[in-house]
UniProtKB/Swiss-Prot annotation:
GO cellular component: cytoplasm
Assembly: Monomer.
GO molecular function list: S-adenosylmethionine:tRNA ribosyltransferase-isomerase activity
Name of the encoding gene: queA
Enzyme's top EC category: transferase
Protein name: S-adenosylmethionine:tRNA ribosyltransferase-isomerase
UniProt superkingdom: Bacteria
Species of provenance: Xanthobacter autotrophicus (strain ATCC BAA-1158 / Py2)
């Protein structure tokens, strides 16, 4: 399918730079293909009205790490050069793949000191060596620390990796430390937030619990590839980025029990959706899953487990808008996005949400 079929124009004023306050006050466009009406303008706090006691919600409990680092290149006989690095994928206990700029000023063997004077890091700085330069322009950083010590140092010296479409319009600040983290954040490892979960508040959780529906967590560490547009002309030419995820045996069993009793599975966000579908066999059985998934969901895909999805409004030509089109149909997706733009919905990570329901849904 041609990628330009998923393109659209979004006026800049529709890009949300801060989340709604309170979070569940964000708008929610309910999309019911074939329904009457097909589109309904509500609030995220209305989500419990669509959930019954037989249903289950699945959320992603990944935690965003402060993966944006600032440092100085140190080279024998060379002048110091300021470096910005965004961690994108952990390779092992001490090595990360990262995008660094100016990349042309870095070569294998260079050392970079992140943090330094004024840093909250007890060590004063975090040191790394450029271990390799990759074909995609990224570098491999081999840190002097490993494991938990490295995690603590990154947390101390790093900044929240706010999305590029926000960073281009304002600087990251202390508010983002809280705003860009979900209520469910528990397992550190993401370099981008599972943004649909940003809408949840304790009050909304209490209302969902009152419906009798069950809540389950999975873990999928979101990579920087989530922001990248598809550059291929056709979807068949796109190579999906891989992300690490886990569906526990207990969660798989609980979700299978929900389906067996005629209940529905609602996923919160594209990350939970992709992970649950990765863990589901052709027979519809959800199995325990641990490892990387590069599932690429486009129109024509048959969903095996997910019955409803809460997600934000996504970038043009992105794999995420393709997933939305796969779930509700391409024409319904285009109508929903056109309506959202005309009605002034806020887009992207800090923006509003849409609740996608299958044809004939509640």
């Amino acid at each position: 399918m041609r990628v330009d079929a998923f393109d659209f124009d979004l006026p800049e004023e529709h890009i949300a730079l801060r989340p709604a306050e309170p979070r569940d006050a964000a708008r929610m466009l309910v999309v019911r293909p074939g329904g009457a009406p097909e589109l309904s303008d509500l609030k995220v706090r209305d989500l419990p009205d669509f959930i019954t006691a037989n249903d289950a919600l699945v959320v992603n409990d990944t935690r965003v790490i402060p993966a944006a680092l600032e440092g100085v290149r140190e080279r024998d006989g060379g002048s110091a050069v300021r470096i910005e690095a965004n961690l994108i994928k952990r390779l092992d206990a001490s090595r990360w793949q990262a995008f660094a700029k100016p990349g042309k000023r870095l070569r294998v063997g260079d050392r970079v000191r992140f943090g330094g004077e004024g840093s909250a890091c007890l060590l004063g700085a975090l040191d790394a060596q450029i271990a390799a330069k990759e074909d995609d322009g990224s570098v491999i950083l081999a840190f002097d620390l490993a494991g938990t010590a490295l995690d603590e140092a990154v947390t101390a010296v790093g900044h929240m990796p706010i999305p590029p479409y926000i960073a281009a319009r304002r600087a990251e600040d202390d508010r983002d430390r809280a705003d860009y983290q979900t209520l469910f954040a528990r397992v550190s490892g993401s370099v981008a937030a599972p943004t649909a979960s940003l809408h949840f508040t304790p009050e909304l959780m209490a209302r969902i619990a009152a419906t009798g529906a069950s809540m389950h967590t999975v873990t999928l560490h979101v990579g920087a590839g989530t922001f990248l547009p598809v550059k291929a002309e056709d979807t068949t030419g796109h190579r999906m980025h891989a992300e690490w995820g886990e569906v526990s045996a207990d969660t798989a069993a609980a979700l299978n029990a929900v389906k067996a009793k005629g209940g529905r599975i609602f996923t919160v966000g594209s990350t939970s959706t992709r992970l649950i579908e990765s863990a589901t066999g052709e027979d519809g059985t959800i199995r325990p899953f641990v490892g990387e998934t590069d599932i690429f969901i486009t129109p024509g895909y048959r969903f095996r487990a997910v019955d409803g999805m809460l997600t934000n409004f996504h970038l043009p030509r992105s794999t995420l808008v393709m997933l939305v089109a796969a779930f509700v149909g391409h024409e319904a997706q285009k109508r929903a996005y056109a309506h959202a733009i005309a009605a002034g919905y806020r887009f992207y990570s800090y923006g509003d949400a849409c609740l996608l329901l299958p044809e004939g849904g509640p």
